[in-house]
């Protein structure tokens, strides 16, 4: 009923509004075009066109068919290439989860551009998660690969890991915060008087981690690192921030870095993927990271000894 030639004929008639013009476009006779449309209407049991002596126009059913027919035809035309890709061991879909600390729109776009050029028929799905939420996606939600799982050892022996680096932290507050000019290491009693600004762990199944908060201390949860830094600048609270994201603000005396009794150790992050069942696209992504290719450099900038500057409204953080 919906063979490629019939779909092309229907689309041409709908677009030209004429059997004769569709015949010219398809290098067929008008009688052939008219017969195909008549047969299609008989097989579907509905009228697809209103006919006048000079033109034809779509019925409601015809409009609905047109909205679907182009997608069907494109799918049929691409199917041979898709089948060859699957036969060559290329995944039909690859789900990639990225740690919030490593996430960058530009980094994702760079990797997507590289992947899309090589695997045009693979569906790529990116997700942004926080702390143990990255492992959660890999363990329980069908994700193929994770950029920035916590630690350097897998949570299950079915995964492979490649250490990417360690995030260095600074304990921060605004320059006009009451604790900013206290001499010497701050005590827990002093710290507890002010809210801890944190980003909530996005784990759904695994146990959530709390970045830093003292017993009895008020906690304020924000959705991302940009908001967290903005809250520090506004004097709302205190807490740890990755050094590359705050060093310029420290140098400008907009933020103050202090020492507290228990400093946060560096956080090692790794690339993680399934040992078994992966295809060529995942293999190529792993190679990009293990070989530290430029296509993935944007994900690793937080590990470098670089400084970042704040753009307006704290919307983006540009590595210089």
From Swiss-Prot:
Residues 2-59 form the HTH lysR-type domain. The keyword Transcription regulation applies. The lineage of its organism: Bacteria, Pseudomonadati, Pseudomonadota, Gammaproteobacteria, Enterobacterales. It comes from the Bacteria. Belongs to the LysR transcriptional regulatory family. InterPro entries: LTTR, LysR_subst-bd, Tscrpt_reg_HTH_LysR, WH-like_DNA-bd_sf, WH_DNA-bd_sf. Positive regulator essential for the expression of allD operon. Binds to the allD promoter. Residues 19-38 bind DNA. The gene is allS. This is HTH-type transcriptional activator AllS. Keywords: Activator, DNA-binding, Transcription, Transcription regulation. GO terms for molecular function: DNA binding; DNA-binding transcription factor activity. Pfam families: HTH_1, LysR_substrate.
């Amino acid at each position: 009923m919906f063979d490629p030639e019939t779909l092309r004929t229907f689309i041409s008639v709908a677009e030209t509004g004429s059997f004769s013009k569709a015949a010219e476009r398809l290098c067929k006779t008008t009688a052939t075009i008219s017969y195909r449309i008549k047969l299609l209407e008989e097989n579907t049991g509905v009228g697809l066109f209103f006919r006048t002596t000079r033109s034809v126009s779509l019925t409601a059913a015809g409009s609905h068919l047109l909205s679907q027919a182009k997608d069907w035809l494109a799918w049929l035309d691409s199917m041979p290439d898709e089948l060859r890709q699957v036969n060559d061991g290329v995944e039909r879909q690859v789900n990639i989860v990225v740690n919030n600390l490593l996430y960058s729109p530009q980094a994702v776009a760079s990797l997507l551009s590289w992947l899309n050029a090589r695997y045009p028929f693979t569906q790529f799905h990116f997700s942004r998660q926080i702390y143990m939420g990255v492992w959660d996606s890999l363990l329980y939600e069908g994700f193929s690969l994770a950029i920035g799982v916590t630690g350097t050892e897998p949570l299950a022996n079915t995964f492979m890991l490649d250490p990417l680096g360690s995030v260095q932290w600074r304990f921060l507050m605004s320059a006009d915060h009451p604790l900013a000019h206290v001499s010497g290491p701050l005590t827990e009693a002093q710290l507890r008087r002010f809210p801890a600004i944190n980003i909530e762990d996005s784990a759904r199944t695994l146990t959530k981690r709390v970045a830093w908060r003292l017993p009895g201390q008020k906690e304020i949860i924000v959705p991302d690192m940009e908001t967290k830094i903005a809250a520090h600048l506004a004097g709302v609270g205190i807490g740890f921030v990755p050094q590359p994201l705050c060093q310029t603000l420290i140098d400008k005396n907009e933020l103050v870095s202090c020492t507290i009794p228990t400093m946060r150790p560096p956080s090692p992050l790794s690339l993680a993927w399934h040992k078994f069942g992966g295809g060529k696209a995942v293999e190529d992504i792993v190679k990009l990271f293990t070989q530290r290719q430029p296509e993935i450099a944007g994900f690793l900038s937080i590990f470098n000894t670089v400084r970042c500057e704040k753009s307006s409204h704290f919307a983006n953080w540009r590595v210089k």
